[in-house]
Amino acid sequence: MYYIAADFGAGSGRVIVGCINNNELTLDEIHRFPNRQINLGGRVYWDFLALFEELKNGLKKAFKKYGPHIRSIGIDTWGVDFGLIDENGRLISNPVCYRDTRTAGILAKAFEQLPKEQFFRLAGNQFMEINTVFQLYSAVLENDAALKSAKKLLFMPDLFAYFLTGKAANEYTIASTSQMMNSISREWDDTIFSKLSLPKNLMQKIVLPGTIIGEITGDLQKELGGTCNVVAVGSHDTASALAAIAAEGDEWAFISSGTWSLMGTITPTPLLTPEVLTADFTNEGAVSGDIRLLKNITGLWLLQSLVKEWTAQGMNCDYSRMVAEGEKSDCESTIDVNDSRFTAPKSMKQAIDDYCRETNQRIPQSQGDYMRLVCLSLANEYARVKQELELSTGRRITTIYIVGGGSQNALLNKLTAQKTGCKVVAGPVEATAIGNIKVQARAAGELKDNDTPILKGNGMALKTYLPQS
């Protein structure tokens, strides 16, 4: 059978067709396209209309090539962001991006209504201004007209599914990033909504991965040249990526390495202790029904911003070359990757230079120096978070699985092994698509819960790094 994975990241999106045959999984990337943020009227948006058009383009290619053999499609995206639907079923506005500044300073205001400790016991999430609950609370405080017109709130993957099928639902793993869901009951939390005066009527039924949302609508079937069911997968991309990891035992952690680095481990139930709150971990849903205990860390956003800046200046930004130069660099300067100055600076290079100057460190002189600085800084942060995970869970961590695009960065993988003292298993690069497709195949009955298909082709390889290497 064939399954479509639509994977939307903060910088790009892909439509991938996966085939499982005799327990072997192969992938075919059908369509790739850029994603970007749009600044308009002092607000930062995602261009959902363009993204949906690209999704349709990918589906047209998939149906043309594979036709009636396609069983279903699953959609995953980044977390927290959402779109609002009016009473006529129309999108009110392009979704606001989590990097918009409307939530600046919102935490203190929210804690006046709902104390931090109580808030954490309910939702179990890391407190970040970007979280859905604070985006929605800022809209309430602004008396946002869009909110008054809204009848439904749909997270980004739910939004794509809605305009494919006409059916509205909130998928569990993406809902768990919102900080509005009770981590124990897995339902929308009445206390959070009432204390912050949030419109609970906008929320939809929470559905689990593997749920069939619906079939592609008739009009779209004609436009796309085919049809299939839309299946809720691990709609938060990290949940899908984690579903691709074939780990045994519990002495392991994962890093989903992309624009963000999401580092954590799996626990059977939410950990809501004061120690977990102090360490700033988040409890989010896993495809398995377990909990992803993790921390959101600024990731390759740092390098992506540098590359964007250098490219605009006409500089050569071949990634492999920069990694090779970084391996030869003797720059030992580091930054605090979570410092707010690196969230959305006008110039990432200048922000890094200023930080080094203020902390009496050597200012990088070459692209290789900047590559090493970023990778070393991330590896140091991973080592710190690893220790916090061990303290919070009472487990020893001996292996770290790095999945996603960042798993291709050999320098980062080597430094992570050295700084954490752990064996690092890097790959597969296509973990998110693999996990997405595995959920669909299980929903179709082609895979059982414990089945792990053999991975074949590009983007499937694993590479191991040892601390002494």
Q: Locations of the language-model features?
A:
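Active-site core segments that coordinate phosphate-bearing ligands/cofactors
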Residues: 4-5, 17-19, 111-123, 134-155, ...
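Short acidic-aromatic active-site loops that bind/stabilize oxyanions
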Residues: 44-52, 125, 129, 206-210, ...
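N-terminal glycine/serine-rich phosphate-binding loop of ATP-dependent small-molecule kinases
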Residues: 1-93, 121, 149, 221-230, ...
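Short, basic and Ser/Thr-rich N-terminal targeting/leader segments
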Residues: 9-11, 69, 76-78, 132, ...
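Glycine-rich beta-strand-to-loop/alpha-helix junction loops that act as flexible
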Residues: 76-79, 209-210, 257-260, 399-407
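Short beta-strand-loop/turn "lid" adjacent to the catalytic site in phosphate-handling enzymes
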Residues: 40, 64-97, 126-130, 161-182, ...
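Short glycine-rich phosphate-binding loop at a beta-alpha junction
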Residues: 69-77, 152, 205, 392-404
